[in-house]
Amino acid sequence: MRPSGRAPDQMRAISIETGFTVHAEGSVLISFGDTRVLVTASVEEKVPPFLRGKGQGWVTAEYGMLPRATHTRGSREAAKGKQSGRTQEIQRLIGRSLRAVVDMAKLGERQIVIDCDVLQADGGTRTASISGGWVALRLAVDKLLASGAIAEDPITAQVAAISCGIHEGTPVLDLDYIEDSNAHADANFVLLDNGNIAEAQATAEGATYDEEALLRLLRLARIGCGEIFAAQRKATGR
């Protein structure tokens, strides 16, 4: 039995609220259970130096947690003067995942920055950030299309992410903090709605696992991402 009482293949409740802020071209508050992340997409009419003059765009991401997003207060990384390795790893993952579904040539020479701020953490903050990031990106691109700034839709597919793990010997979907802390294997999958895999991260802690267990985790991830894709479509009216 999972601590939450959920079935092995049961997601936490998903909520996606769009238009959560007034200034960003795209914004959402996404919740996976008690994990809540504010995600904004900001359009900038510039690109990184390595892309200047090449006629194509870029999508990048930044990630951070509010000091009391967790059980005990954590210091702001800005106050420390540098980002942690974990933060850098997660924001690179978010950026890679979203770039996997964008045709940069159709975006034109502009950049979209996805900012992910964790308001409350109960496991799965990176997967919620990616899943909400796609919605914010979709909203921002829709504004570019509506204004005539771009002629063609650069988004090629939906992308979503979910965590899975082996808890007390059972593969389970969408780990919360308690499960994640006690799982002897955990994985994060980033999937496209066409079935392709953008990223797969799976690690063992204390005990290894076999190939069949990995495939069972992937099958669970497909179930979870299917639910997220449906929530994304509902949020964006597509």
Swiss-Prot record:
Phosphate binds at residues 86, 124-126. It is an enzyme of class 2 (transferase). Keywords: Nucleotidyltransferase, RNA-binding, rRNA processing, Transferase, tRNA processing, tRNA-binding. Its EC number is 2.7.7.56. It catalyses: tRNA(n+1) + phosphate = tRNA(n) + a ribonucleoside 5'-diphosphate. Pfam families: RNase_PH, RNase_PH_C. It comes from the Bacteria. InterPro entries: ExoRNase_PH_dom1, ExoRNase_PH_dom2, ExoRNase_PH_dom2_sf, PNPase/RNase_PH_dom_sf, Ribosomal_Su5_D2-typ_SF, RNase_PH, RNase_PH_bac-type, RNase_PH_CS. The keyword tRNA-binding applies. One of its GO terms (molecular function) is tRNA nucleotidyltransferase activity. Phosphorolytic 3'-5' exoribonuclease that plays an important role in tRNA 3'-end maturation. Removes nucleotide residues following the 3'-CCA terminus of tRNAs; can also add nucleotides to the ends of RNA molecules by using nucleoside diphosphates as substrates, but this may not be physiologically important. Probably plays a role in initiation of 16S rRNA degradation (leading to ribosome degradation) during starvation. PANTHER family: EXOSOME COMPLEX COMPONENT, EXOSOME COMPLEX COMPONENT RRP41. Homohexameric ring arranged as a trimer of dimers. Belongs to the RNase PH family. This is Ribonuclease PH.
